[in-house]
Amino acid sequence: MAFPAPAFSLANLLNGSYGVDTPEDVERLRSEQREEAAAACRNYRPLSAVDVSESVTEDAHSLQTPDGAPAEAVSDEFVTYGAEDYLEKSDDELLVAFETMVKPMRIGQLWCPAFNKCSFISSIAMARALLLAPRTSHRTMKCFEDLVAAIYTKSDFYYSEECEADDVQMDISSRDVPGYSFEPWSRTSGFEPPPICEACDMIMYQCPCFDFNALKKSCAERTFADDYVIEGLDGVVDNATLLSNLGPFLVPVKCQYEKCPTPPIAIPPNLNRATDRVDINLVQSICDSTLPTHSNYDDSFHQVFVESADYSIDLDHVRLRQSDLIAKIPDSGHMIPVLNTGSGHKRVGTTKEVLTAIKKRNADVPELGDSVNLSRLSKAVAERFFISYINGNSLASSNFVNVVSNFHDYMEKWKSSGLSYDDLPDLHAENLQFYDHMIKSDVKPVVSDTLNIDRPIPATITYHKKSITSQFSPLFTALFERFQRCLRERIILPVGKISSLEMAGFDVKNKYCLEIDLSKFDKSQGEFHLLIQEHILNGLGCPAPITKWWCDFHRFSYIRDRRAGVGMPISFQRRTGDAFTYFGNTIVTMAEFAWCYDTDQFEKLLFSGDDSLGFSLLPPVGDSSKFTTLYNMEAKVMEPSVPYICSKFLLSDEFGNTFSVPDPLREVQRLGTKKIPYSDNDEFLFAHFMSFVDRLKFLDRMSQSCIDQLSIFFELKYKKSGEEAALMLGAFKKYTANFQSYKELYYSDRHQCELINSFCSTEFRVERVNSNKQRKKYGIERRCDDKRRTPTGSYGGGEEAETKVSQTKSTGTRSQKSQRESAFESQTVPLPTVLSSGWSGTDRVVPPCERGGVTRA
């Protein structure tokens, strides 16, 4: 009696009515199969012997297998497993099956996709039903395991056309082994679709006309020859003998073919490595190619243009006082750089320059945030701050330390500036709402190619006097040290004695980076940021009266620039030069970051002022728009993001340790600075040299792997050639070697003028007598036998004046006899010459004495 096949539906699929055997049927079939297999083993008779001299034909299809084979146990693999069998399995067995079929991506302790027992078993049942359903598409359906994975991940059930084309075009003849021929083998799914009876359209396990003996025979006859087609093996008796004799040789050979990826071509190492053989022209060419708009930049008269041109500005509540301006203090001049890297001259704090800086740095506060409940939301942000960053046990067990010691250290530091204990004022008698204002005379180097269209505007400093700052700074310094001790291990603030950018055991490679660039950070802070700081300071243990007092005179303040005669009121925004500037900016950045991103997804988090950097194994997930809508900040997520913070790149060496490298582009620009004062003994130049050496102390750790990392990060950040960064390292290596090499980068007009007028060395002896005519600035070279005399005059008694220059041969190394002579050797000064051969030009290497002739001074 034929029963109608149940209709396909998800309900029939899950309850076992369609395509799934009931547990009773499965158990009954398994017991019958075991009994039949045991009977076959008892009735087995070995085959008759075959003549050894017979050779095996080369036709693969003519190979015959024995009718039966002894078996100690019969495998149950050909029995179909249904969804009910997986329901009876343990969780560990299901995890193994899930990892085998779905093949999830393992990321740490997480699986992607995640394991879900119900979804996995439903996917198995659905895959089995789809394989049994009639085919309606010409495309090739995936095998059982891949189909389960496709259903679980909600992807395509069919193989793509590219995969099918690859399977068709796969050529295996080139991989044949002499004497053997292999056939392509595809991975088995582990699922055997049950046979369907053509008469009753039922599964043959449940059909009366099912021939189990034929099924048993087909399974028992499967031998080694069914998987490996053997050709040309003479003298082989049968497959059993072949397996016993050649089995150890053939078993390791897997007849499995896959499309091999194209092997990567090994690129030979570049032999043109950066070395210390660098000259000044090479460094200038690097600047010209990397910074095309900086090479011809000269702002010598830019401020003159600003002061002399018409000026218009729009500011609210500004006060100008032009009656008692302080004139510029003249200095003794500055060293002139040989390199032209786009560095500007020092800015003078005139009225127009200060107004321009205030317009950009302090006025025109952006209003990008939405309306919120400040008190409630500020408390929530502070709570999130402590949950994300602070170790509560460490905070509870730590105390303030070294407050008085920090106070004495501050007084000793500024003792040379005239600060003493007698000058400390009574803070209750001072109006702390008044701040002094000034502009930074040194403009920050510009790395963008905009110097041809945009003039950099100097930054501003809003500060209290040292007598006031000295009483707040020790408290906030001790509080910041306590804050650092209570941070979680993955949080790093690279400042102070207990933290830096050197991270042992942490590798920045193969990590996702998140860098947030916050523009207009100081003036964008409002009352919401001040309330957040107040809650965080109270939570860190700062005395509540001091916190309240500090926040009160930051709500409304008045800044004044005495030199420029400019003053204006400000409110809430960050004071860039008080005792709480760095600490306050850091906790504001950390609080904003914790509210916009889940900090648990990061392995390392670095914060310093308004700079932030995070490292994670997965792409960071968060809402960066809250920086603007909630915190009133102009935020930009740097793409592509590289390990870069505080103008430094983070690199990892071969041992997995991370160290910091200053930005080569900014260091090259500093080599052309115009702010080094002139001194006779080069003390200021030597101080800059020592600072340059301290910043580049990483050069000894730069292996080829680190140089390659730096080149890649440099290209990603600036979209410029990474080879230029390697050449910059070669220049740094040369100019950090000794002070004499570093002195090649600067010269002074004063030295040059003195050298042209007069000089003294062992090769030349210059005798001067008074003359009524002006001294000539350039020497005229003529032949030794020229007897012409200089013009006579009545200067100084009317005596004739003749300058005699005698020439001596140079023997050995010349000794330096004066400071002017040493300056002549370190500075290259062009000397116009007229040689005896008639050639005229500028000679920088060989002195005139070695050319021959007489020099007249």
Curated annotation (Swiss-Prot):
This protein's record includes keyword Transport: no
Described purpose of this protein according to its UniProt entry: RNA-dependent RNA polymerase which replicates the viral genome composed of 3 RNA segments, RNA1, RNA2 and RNA3.
SUPFAM superfamilies (UniProt xref): DNA/RNA polymerases (SSF56672)
Keyword Nucleotide-binding: yes
Family under the similarity heading: Belongs to the ssRNA positive-strand viruses RNA-directed RNA polymerase family.
PROSITE patterns tied to this protein: RDRP_SSRNA_POS
Comp. bias intervals (Polar residues): 804-816, 824-840
Source organism: Cucumber mosaic virus (strain MB-8) (CMV)
Biased composition (Basic and acidic residues): 780-789
Protein name per the record: RNA-directed RNA polymerase 2a
Domain RdRp catalytic: 511-624
Matches recorded under Pfam families: RdRP_2
